[in-house]
């Protein structure tokens, strides 16, 4: 995970002239921290290995930011500074000025007019400015699971709580929603106790950089132990995973060595989960050796949780002996492109959430793109307050490693016998046949040879000039027949050694442990790591639900997870209802599931047998599970499917029309083609937005063209639905009658240009199928010539893709140009479809195209070579 360090300095300005020009103590501490971080960035720290074939995790980076409030002087970094050194630098290039240098320069050479005008600002307003600057920095943090945030607050004395309350709230935002570790460096420890308890922060007096920043930390989060039967869970916060040792060679030398090696997998982005989930206790003798990897880490608690329940949990884990361990799982999402910052955890959402004054602060769930993977750790006691976390290979990571290890073990354990016993072993290995088997083989051979000779004589007589001497041919035929028959009999008859034949009734051969483990499917180790897909989907739905919808929860009642959890059966309780053969003990009655406050009451004394004997009219009046489908003669399932398809098509068009213009009833028919609402994502740009933009630029033509636009929207609907038979009657706002207009079938890629088929509402035009599209007239040529927003974005993306391919040597004349162009266009468009705004769209297009160009080109070239 990448490390983000934020240094905050709050101090009152000295009034005497001698102390005004000195560097404040808090900024001096920040300089030491910055120097130490630069040293950390030149060292390579071993991280978690790859958990997917998508790629390897990238090298860990360090970022730094500064916020200083010194009297009325206010400074804050505009962005996070990357501290990782560049591999190559140009001689003529000037060094980039860091945020710390800018702060010291602004402090030593202040603007006189600005400085005098800020003297009258109150402390409350200054801290509100600081809070806003801190919120801007928090919005620039990456998606959750990729960054470890450390906040260091340097202040000689504690300010008044009512003055700094807004700034403390900004730090609380970093703590709760970005999992930041807060450390307060101050000599006034007693004054900070109340605020430190609110922030779950650690208050120290010294400012040694090595004590404040732990460079070995790779992950921070909670340990979660859940109980499935009662759907309860317990969390132990402030745990961390640390690397055992760091490599001492510089960062750029490590990168240079990697570039000389053959890179098998690209660098991808890993987003780790927030909790280590307990799986099970296990004996070390039960874990196969090929599941245990060589990667070993340390599990401990952070300095902010030296007391409390987390310390007790760590003591329990440290008590695990060498024979027993606990397995924990850490989830991870792997994506080739970085996920954007989570809007659900932005400063705006934080203010809205805190304005409701919640009792407990909950973290909103964020759905990340990419492949879902897992890390498994075997936790054992190590002593001195640490635990050893050994990385285990999961079932998806093993592939053929298990079979390969077993094969090597058998080859290594094989020991050839002595040469003195070689003769007896050779004789024992000779196949032993009974007399009956030999007699059967000879009878089969004689019958086969007789049939072969008869067939040969028939064919020989059928020849026009038969040869007199055919003794050699018969001799060859009999020899070939004998070889075929004996070979066939030896493959069919049971050939066992004489020694094994004697011992076969005395004792049975012992089965090795590895063979028993593989032959018994119930003991497969892969079964222990398989996840329940249904429970995983429920957890995802629970995380996806917004924490701001408290009013909706009151209307809908309890959540589905709580309602369904009340009717779950334990495994022992479930087995009571079935025999060992899997047959039900009796007629199983459906459980009465409580849905809200209204229970589904069954008809008393009604059983499936009685229900089968009732006529349709009486059975329809009964209340029993599934009657609406079992007794419905109108095909309710088919009607439900048709209604869901109808509803999915209506959603996009209804929201588009009601949100973009005045409500106008337009009856229309839908086509059986799939709806674009199913294929599109919520962040896509509607095609009608370009027309609205044009109308905003021409307010004088709004009234004159309102009727035409009504017809335009209706025709665009029909063009998108792709119907070639439906007729649409356009209802105008006045009393005039609108003629029916036929919408021609358009392909999906030409749906955006359907505005060229608009007909004037005041004219009656009858179009035959043979009339070409070029003969259609339109009253608004400016709407036809105007390029829509989606067309413009597609054109821009095609130009970017073409230029990117030319950079990699794939020109228009290249045989793979067309395939690479289309494939790279589709992939880039897929990564751009979730953008909420078009600001910086061109840069995002270039980034998406350049990140995927090499992979696409390699794919198409390999495909071309195979042809």
Curated annotation (Swiss-Prot):
The keyword Cell cycle applies. InterPro entries: MTBP (IPR039061), MTBP_C (IPR029418), MTBP_central (IPR029420), MTBP_N (IPR029421). Residues 679-699, 724-793 are annotated as: Disordered. Transmembrane segments: none annotated. The keyword Cell cycle applies. It comes from the Eukaryota. One of its GO terms (biological process) is regulation of cell cycle. Residues 779-793 have a biased composition (Basic and acidic residues). Keywords: Cell cycle, Growth arrest, Ubl conjugation pathway. Residues 724-735 have a biased composition (Low complexity). Belongs to the MTBP family. May play a role in mdm2-dependent p53/TP53 homeostasis in unstressed cells. Inhibits autoubiquitination of mdm2, thereby enhancing mdm2 stability. This promotes mdm2-mediated ubiquitination of p53/TP53 and its subsequent degradation. This is Mdm2-binding protein. It comes from Xenopus tropicalis.
């Amino acid at each position: 995970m990448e490390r983000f360090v934020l240094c905050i300095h709050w101090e009152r300005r000295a009034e005497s002239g001698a102390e005004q020009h000195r560097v404040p103590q808090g900024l001096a501490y920040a300089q030491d921290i910055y120097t130490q971080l630069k040293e950390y960035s030149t060292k390579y720290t071993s991280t978690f290995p790859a958990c997917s074939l998508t790629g390897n995790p990238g090298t860990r980076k360090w970022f730094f930011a500064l916020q200083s409030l010194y009297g009325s002087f206010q400074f804050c970094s505009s962005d996070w500074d990357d501290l990782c050194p560049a591999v190559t630098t140009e001689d003529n290039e000037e060094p980039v000025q860091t945020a710390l240098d800018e702060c010291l320069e602004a402090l030593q050479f202040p603007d006189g007019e600005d400085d005098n005008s800020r003297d009258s600002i109150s402390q409350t307003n200054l801290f509100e400015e600081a809070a806003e600057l801190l919120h801007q920095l928090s919005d620039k943090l990456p998606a959750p699971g990729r960054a470890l945030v450390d906040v260091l607050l340097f202040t000689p004395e504690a300010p008044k709580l009512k003055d700094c309350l807004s700034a403390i709230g900004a730090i609380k935002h970093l703590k709760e929603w970005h999992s930041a570790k807060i450390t307060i460096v101050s000599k006034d420890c007693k004054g900070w106790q109340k605020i430190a308890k609110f922030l779950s922060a650690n208050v120290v007096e010294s400012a040694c950089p090595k004590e404040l920043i732990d460079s070995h930390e790779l992950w921070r989060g909670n340990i979660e132990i859940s109980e499935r039967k009662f759907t309860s869970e317990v969390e132990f916060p402030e745990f961390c995973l640390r690397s055992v040792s760091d490599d001492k060679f510089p960062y750029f030398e490590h990168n240079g060595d990697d570039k000389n090696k053959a890179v098998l997998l690209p660098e991808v982005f890993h987003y780790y989960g927030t909790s280590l989930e307990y799986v099970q206790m296990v004996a070390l003798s039960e874990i196969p050796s090929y599941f245990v990897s060589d990667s070993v880490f340390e599990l401990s608690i952070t300095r902010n949780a030296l007391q409390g329940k987390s310390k007790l949990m760590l003591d329990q884990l440290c008590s695990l002996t060498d024979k027993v361990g606990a397995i924990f799982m850490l989830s991870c999402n792997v994506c080739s492109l970085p996920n954007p910052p989570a809007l659900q955890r932005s400063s705006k959402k934080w203010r809205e959430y805190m304005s409701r004054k919640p009792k407990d602060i909950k973290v909103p769930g964020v759905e990340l793109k990419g492949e879902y993977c897992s890390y498994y750790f075997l936790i054992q006691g190590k002593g001195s307050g640490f635990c050893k976390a050994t990385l285990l290979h999961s079932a998806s990571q093993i592939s053929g490693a298990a079979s390969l290890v077993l094969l090597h073990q058998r080859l290594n354990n094989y020991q050839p016998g002595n040469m003195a016993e070689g003769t007896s072993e050779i004789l024992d290995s000779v196949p032993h046949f009974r007399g009956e088997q030999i007699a059967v083989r000879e009878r089969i051979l004689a019958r086969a040879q007789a049939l072969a000779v008869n067939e040969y004589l028939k064919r020989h007589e059928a020849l026009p000039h038969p040869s007199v001497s055919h003794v050699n041919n018969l001799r060859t035929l009999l020899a070939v027949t004998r070889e075929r028959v004996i070979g066939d009999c030896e493959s069919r008859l049971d050939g066992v050694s004489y020694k094994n034949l004697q011992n076969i009734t005395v004792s049975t051969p012992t089965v090795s442990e590895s063979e028993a483990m593989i032959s018994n499917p119930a003991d497969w180790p892969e079964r222990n790591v398989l996840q329940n897909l249904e429970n995983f989907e429920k957890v995802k739905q629970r995380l996806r639900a917004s924490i701001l919808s408290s009013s909706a929860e009151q209307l809908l009642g309890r959540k589905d997870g709580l309602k369904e959890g009340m009717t779950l059966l334990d495994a022992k309780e479930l087995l009571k209802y079935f025999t060992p053969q899997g047959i039900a003990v009796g007629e199983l009655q459906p459980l009465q599931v409580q849905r809200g406050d209204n229970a589904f009451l069954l008809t008393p004394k009604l059983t499936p047998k009685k229900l089968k004997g009732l006529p349709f009219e009486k059975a329809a009046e009964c209340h029993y599970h599934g009657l609406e489908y079992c007794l419905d003669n109108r095909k309710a399932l088919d009607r439900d499917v048709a209604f869901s398809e109808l509803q999915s098509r209506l959603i996009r068009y209804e929201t588009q029309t009601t949100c973009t213009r005045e409500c106008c009833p337009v009856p229309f028919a839908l086509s059986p083609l799939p709806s674009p609402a199913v294929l599109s994502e919520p962040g896509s740009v509607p095609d009608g937005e370009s027309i609205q933009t044009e109308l905003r630029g021409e307010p004088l033509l709004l009234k004159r063209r309102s009727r035409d636009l009504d017809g335009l929207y209706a025709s665009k609907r029909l063009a998108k639905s792709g119907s070639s038979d439906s007729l649409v009657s356009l209802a105008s706002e006045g009393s005039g009658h609108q003629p029916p207009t036929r919408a021609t079938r358009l392909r999906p890629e030409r749906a955006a240009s359907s505005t060229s088929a608009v007909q004037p509402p005041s004219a009656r035009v009858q179009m035959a199928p043979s009339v070409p599209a070029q003969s259609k007239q339109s009253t608004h040529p400016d709407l036809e010539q105007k390029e829509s927003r989606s067309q413009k974005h597609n054109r821009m993306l095609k130009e970017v893709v073409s230029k990117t391919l030319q950079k990699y040597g794939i020109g228009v004349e290249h045989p793979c140009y067309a395939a690479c162009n289309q494939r790279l266009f589709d992939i880039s468009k897929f990564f751009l479809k979730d953008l909420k705004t078009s600001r910086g769209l061109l840069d995002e297009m270039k980034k998406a195209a350049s990140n995927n160009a090499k992979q696409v080109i390699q794919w198409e070239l390999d495909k071309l070579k195979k042809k």
